[in-house]
């Protein structure tokens, strides 16, 4: 089974590009399932129901989000109604929607968990405190994908090591990571650089 994970779809231009490229790419690469991050799909940022419909009509099967999703008040109304759009599980039980979902392909069920890192992102609980119970929720799924939306590479690597042998994939298909220096690429953000910055 071929599963495609797509990082942040940004704005109307990103949605339009997706619609023009994804159908042909799915056919060319024999993609069975597409999971995309839609937290910045609305103009500016956030996600709206119209942006979500644009993404789905392009050929995406499932949408994950991140911290920017909640910048649009509309999201609070449709997250509870959609099982194919999930929010980070560790943003609090009071938030609408769920932090996990299942894609039922008939013979194969794919469990998807959405988490949010804590470094440089406000408002999230420790993702390690909830991941075991979330993995239990999707234990009947043959394929288990964890999308950890995080800034620090160290958080993503730590989650990957923790879920080694438990999850099929731990991914972070996001483009907002800091990439200025090798230290920053490896999650060592708070170490001072020699040039004083």
Question: Model-derived features: where do they sit?
Answer:
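Acidic, metal/ion-coordinating pockets
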Residues: 1-197
């Amino acid at each position: 089974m071929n599963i495609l994970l797509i990082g942040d779809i940004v704005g109307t231009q990103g949605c339009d590009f997706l619609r023009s490229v994804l159908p042909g790419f799915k056919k060319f690469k024999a993609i069975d399932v597409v999971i995309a991050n839609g937290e910045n799909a609305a103009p500016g940022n956030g996600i709206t129901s119209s942006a979500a419909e644009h993404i789905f009509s392009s050929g995406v099967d499932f949408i994950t989000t991140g911290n920017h999703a909640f910048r649009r008040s509309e999201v609070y109304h449709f997250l509870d109604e959609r099982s194919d759009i999930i929010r980070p599980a560790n943003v609090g039980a009071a938030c609408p929607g769920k932090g996990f979902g299942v894609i039922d392909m008939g013979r194969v069920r794919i469990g998807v968990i959405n988490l949010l890192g804590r470094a440089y992102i406000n408002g999230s609980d420790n993702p390690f405190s909830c991941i075991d119970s979330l993995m239990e929720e999707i234990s009947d799924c043959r394929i288990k994908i964890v999308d950890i939306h995080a800034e620090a590479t160290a958080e993503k690597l730590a989650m990957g090591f923790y879920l080694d042998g438990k999850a099929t994939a731990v991914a972070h298909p996001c483009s907002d990571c800091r990439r200025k220096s090798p230290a920053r690429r490896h999650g060592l953000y708070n170490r001072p650089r020699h040039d004083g910055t």
